[in-house]
């Protein structure tokens, strides 16, 4: 009778078994259901992306407000309690810009094109005039006239090479190519070297392909320009450390400039077509081989001159309304514990990959969670879905929200799961704080690879890398920054594909995604599956699936890497090694405790004393990440509280473990004084103390 009633499908069998042995299905049943083909449709994700990218929607624009309304109405249609949280933030827009090149004193200056061309049969030609003119957000208004000097990627080490070559950058206009480091640091490094202005071009070697480009191939067209922010801080620069609410306190423009987070010289982004023109005007020594461009590019020389660049930029700063959309699915057993999923919505232009591939996935996750609720699922902990605004300007929407809710979030958030560019191509990538490594890897074994149905994401992931599977969240590249680096929340960032050629240009549209990024939208579906599964495990498992042993091993490796940097100096790393050993012991102890609880005979989660025991254990697991923060922040960078993960001082995209130690080592190498090396030792002690605090928290002990 039992068997005769359930012969229709394996899913029906699983459902019946669950209902036979449990009053309601086990949470793992719902997790499997979340991944089933009946719960997801590529078409739904495609429709969301198409709708979100119909018009350019830069932060502060009417089009972006319409996109926010679409996200809000979609979440509400899924019966998710949702609201908009507005902030009133300083954003900048271009008013006037020009770039001319004088090649000789006799010839008239060449006006370099700053516009991006509409391509043939462009379906978005009718709204192309709504694309904001190419610019750098928060660039300094002004004019710079000077001999052009080629500075490669504009890194600190590139300027060292130029000094060795005898090339003086002071009083010149630096020509740099995009790549390797954050554009804001390209400008800041140019200023530090004495440049009076910076022009950054999209080099065909890195972005332009081999003679074919979009719409025929995935590569950046000759007129394509990567726009973006050159602000080096996080959040509204006029409200450092507090939320940009209506009529709040703001610091002055002079104080913003003194912060060091906004450039003090003008800059402009240009295409590789314009970059070639400037490069042909530069003489002097031939640049090193690794500084050269790709096939078809002119020979790259360093200058200075004889070409003279005349750069003019005028921008306006306005207080604009930005809108975060927040959806809440309240937990049943622990409503005061939050699992947060976040993605930003604003785009420099159409934003098909960056960021609305992620927004489409967020809405897909929301829809599947609604379907689970209709099947009877209720999360143990509260799930919060966040759609951020003004990320592109400097992580503004997420930062303002975290700053406004700092104490609540610091005491209640279990984890933050970020997806920015969900899909830009093939190949899964993940970064996280180390206690989440095991969870992400485990989830990847349960989701089918979208490009090879015979294997899982984990199978393709592990075969495509020779290094660590999971990266780290030290860079300031997306909305996880406020959660990890400011308040110390365990976090992860997930994506398919790495960098892509049309990044931050007007060619990042639905057509590009449909032709090259994800033609069948299977990668989008896979991101939604993995993102949602990790969230479900964090929301539903009685004992949080954190493993701090991964953290201890990661820190040990980082200290070993430090040894070469302080070799030959009177620097003691013993405090670090000792504190990490204690963390390792604490991690093993709590892992053993989790196993013993799960394996105990007659264990039931409904007993009050067991609930209290598990709650206390979970609090230790949740709060240990907070222990890696320090209220004093990093040296000269108060907002960054995390002593393990934060951006490099000279590259916002990059990072090393122990950023405070790394910064002081670089300074000590430059000054080479006893005091500067003493500062290095002080930072080592600070980190060691933080790791010791983490061990005590994990053990739940008082000394």
Task: Show which residues each predicted segment covers.
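A conserved hydrophobic secondary-structure block that centers on an alpha-helix together
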Residues: 151-219, 332, 336, 348, ...
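Soluble metallo-hydrolase cores and metallopeptidase-like ectodomains found primarily
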Residues: 126-161, 236-352, 367, 371-375
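Alpha-helical metal-binding/catalytic segments enriched in His/Glu/Asp
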Residues: 325, 341-395, 400, 531
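His/Asp/Glu-rich mid-to-C-terminal helical/loop segments that flank catalytic regions of hydrolases
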Residues: 384, 500-557, 669-703
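Noncatalytic luminal/extracellular "stalk/propeptide" segments of secretory-pathway proteins
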Residues: 8-9, 24-31, 50-170, 180, ...
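Second-shell loop/turn segments in exported
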Residues: 31-39, 53-62, 134-135, 139, ...
């Amino acid at each position: 009778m039992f068997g005769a009633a359930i012969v229709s499908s394996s899913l029906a069998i699983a459902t019946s078994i669950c209902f036979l042995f449990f009053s309601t299905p086990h949470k793992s049943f719902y997790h499997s259901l979340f991944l089933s083909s009946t719960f997801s449709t590529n078409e739904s994700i495609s429709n969301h992306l198409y709708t979100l990218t119909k018009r350019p929607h830069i932060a502060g624009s009417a089009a972006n407000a319409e996109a926010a309304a679409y996200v809000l109405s979609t979440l509400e249609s899924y019966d998710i309690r949702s609201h908009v949280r507005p902030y009133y933030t300083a954003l900048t827009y271009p008013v006037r810009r020009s770039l001319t090149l004088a090649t000789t004193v006799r010839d008239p200056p060449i006006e370099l094109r700053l516009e991006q061309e509409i391509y043939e049969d462009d379906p978005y030609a009718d709204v192309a005039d709504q694309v904001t003119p190419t610019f750098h957000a928060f660039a300094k208004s002004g004019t710079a006239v000077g001999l052009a000097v080629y500075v490669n990627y504009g890194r600190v080490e590139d300027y060292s090479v130029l000094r060795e070559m005898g090339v003086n950058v002071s009083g010149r206009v630096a020509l740099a190519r995009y790549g390797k480091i954050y554009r804001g640091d390209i400008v800041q490094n140019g200023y530090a070297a004495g440049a009076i202005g910076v022009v950054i071009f999209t080099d065909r070697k890195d972005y332009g392909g081999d003679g074919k480009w979009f719409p025929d191939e995935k590569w950046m067209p000759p007129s394509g320009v990567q726009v973006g922010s050159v602000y080096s801080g996080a959040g509204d620069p006029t409200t450092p450390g507090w939320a940009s609410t209506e009529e709040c306190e703001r610091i002055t423009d002079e104080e913003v400039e003194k912060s060091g987070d906004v450039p003090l010289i003008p800059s402009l982004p240009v295409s590789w077509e314009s970059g070639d023109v400037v490069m042909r005007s530069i003489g002097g020594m031939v640049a090193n081989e690794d500084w050269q461009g790709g096939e078809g590019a002119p020979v790259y020389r360093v200058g200075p001159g004889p070409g003279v660049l005349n750069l003019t930029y005028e921008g306006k700063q306005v207080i604009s309304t930005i809108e975060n959309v927040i959806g809440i699915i309240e937990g049943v057993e622990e409503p005061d514990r939050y699992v947060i999923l976040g993605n930003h919505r604003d785009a420099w232009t159409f934003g098909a990959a960056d960021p609305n591939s992620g927004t489409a996935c967020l809405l897909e996750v929301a829809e599947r969670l609604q379907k689970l609720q209709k099947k009877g699922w209720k999360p143990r902990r509260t799930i919060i879905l966040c759609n951020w605004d003004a990320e592109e300007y400097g992580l503004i929407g997420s930062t303002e929200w975290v700053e406004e809710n700092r104490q609540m979030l610091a005491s209640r958030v279990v984890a933050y799961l970020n997806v920015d560019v969900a899909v830009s191509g093939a190949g899964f990538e993940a970064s996280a704080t180390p206690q989440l490594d095991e969870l992400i890897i485990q989830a990847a074994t349960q989701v089918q690879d979208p490009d090879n149905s015979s294997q899982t994401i984990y199978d393709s992931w592990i075969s495509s890398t020779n290094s660590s599977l999971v990266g780290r969240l030290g860079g300031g590249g997306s909305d996880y920054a406020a959660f990890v680096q400011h308040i110390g929340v365990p976090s992860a960032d997930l994506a398919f594909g790495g960098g892509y050629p049309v990044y931050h240009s007007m060619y990042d549209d639905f057509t590009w995604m449909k032709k090259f990024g994800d033609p069948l939208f299977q990668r989008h579906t896979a991101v939604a599956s993995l993102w949602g599964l990790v969230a479900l495990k964090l929301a539903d498992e009685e004992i949080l699936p954190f493993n701090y042993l991964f953290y201890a091993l990661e820190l040990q490796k980082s200290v070993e890497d430090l040894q070469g940097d302080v070799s030959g100096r009177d620097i003691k790393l013993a405090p670090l090694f000792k504190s990490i050993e204690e963390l390792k012991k604490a991690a093993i102890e709590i892992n053993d405790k989790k196993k013993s609880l799960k394996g105990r005979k007659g264990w039931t989660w409904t007993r009050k004393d067991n609930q209290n025991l598990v709650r206390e254990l979970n609090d230790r697991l949740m709060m240990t990440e907070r222990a890696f923060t320090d209220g004093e922040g990093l040296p000269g960078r108060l907002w960054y509280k995390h002593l393990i993960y934060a951006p490099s001082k000279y590259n916002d995209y990059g990072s090393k473990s122990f950023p405070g130690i790394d910064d002081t080592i670089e300074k000590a190498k430059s000054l080479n004084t006893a005091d500067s090396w003493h500062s290095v030792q002080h930072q080592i002690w600070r980190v060691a103390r933080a790791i010791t605090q983490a061990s005590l928290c994990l053990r739940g002990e008082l000394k």
